[in-house]
């Protein structure tokens, strides 16, 4: 972790992170916790939540599915009680969705991907905004993807929702900017971890290739020829929460090694 960023994060920042018990979300939570932030997270994985409770008992947790507006309402009620307010929302929850040609994607898979990736951002943003209005350092960070600017063959539901998050971010930046609320999107590339391995496996099956061939092909489209570490995403979150980003809003910031095509 870059100590320069840590030094510029306000101690005691009140943060909500969705899907914060595992994966990228967990790394973001750990980075913010190191900075002295007060954090409340939601996740659908009860085992991951239990592990987070054991490792970081100071972090508040709620088991909730962001695709369900009523569960989001309960989550925010618990988070507000725990934190006493809100300075930062990290809209991290998302799913990979199906890997298939458009005519092989079921309406149910399409709707589930939209429900989690896009509706979930909306449900959380609408609950966070009244709280952020009372913050002197109000920040909303939405997790999109490089697929949200390039498209992604055989991953149409995922790419469509991630494009949607970019439009969602830019619209809210204009709407909420006059109230001092900064809104940005982070666009990760190939982030190391179980999710990208599942994506590679599904793509290999769809394309009739080996997983090694798919990974090599995907990395050949990255200028730096390497994957992204979850901590790289956490570093960007820290920066966007810092005073150094006080005039950054409405931006879609890629952390991807320069993905040229997908």
Question: Which residues make up each language-model segment?
Answer:
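Active-site helix of classical SDR
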Residues: 125, 161, 169
């Amino acid at each position: 972790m870059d100590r320069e960023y840590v030094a510029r994060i306000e101690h005691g920042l009140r943060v909500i992170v969705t899907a914060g018990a595992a994966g990228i979300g967990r790394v973001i939570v750990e980075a913010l916790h190191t900075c002295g932030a007060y954090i409340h997270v939601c996740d659908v994985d009860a085992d991951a939540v239990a592990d987070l409770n054991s490792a970081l008992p100071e972090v508040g947790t709620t088991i909730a599915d962001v695709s369900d507006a009523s569960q989001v309402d309960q989550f925010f009620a618990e988070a507000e009680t725990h934190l006493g307010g809100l300075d930062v929302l990290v809209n991290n929850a998302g799913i990979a969705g199906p890997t298939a040609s458009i005519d092989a994607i079921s309406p149910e898979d399409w709707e589930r991907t939209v429900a989690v990736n896009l509706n979930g951002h909306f449900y959380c943003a609408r609950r966070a905004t009244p709280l952020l209005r009372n913050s002197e350092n109000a920040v909303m960070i939405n997790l999109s993807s490089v697929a949200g600017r390039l498209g992604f063959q055989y991953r149409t539901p995922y790419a469509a929702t991630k494009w949607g998050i970019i439009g969602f971010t830019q619209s809210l930046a204009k709407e909420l900017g006059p109230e001092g609320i900064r809104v940005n999107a982070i666009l990760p590339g190939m982030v190391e971890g179980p999710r990208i391995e599942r994506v590679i496996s599904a793509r290999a099956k769809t394309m009739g290739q080996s997983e090694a061939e798919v990974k090599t092909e995907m990395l050949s489209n990255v200028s730096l020829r390497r994957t992204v570490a979850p901590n790289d995403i956490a570093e960007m979150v820290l920066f966007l929460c810092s005073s150094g980003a006080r005039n950054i809003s409405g931006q879609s910031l890629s952390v991807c090694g320069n993905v040229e095509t997908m």
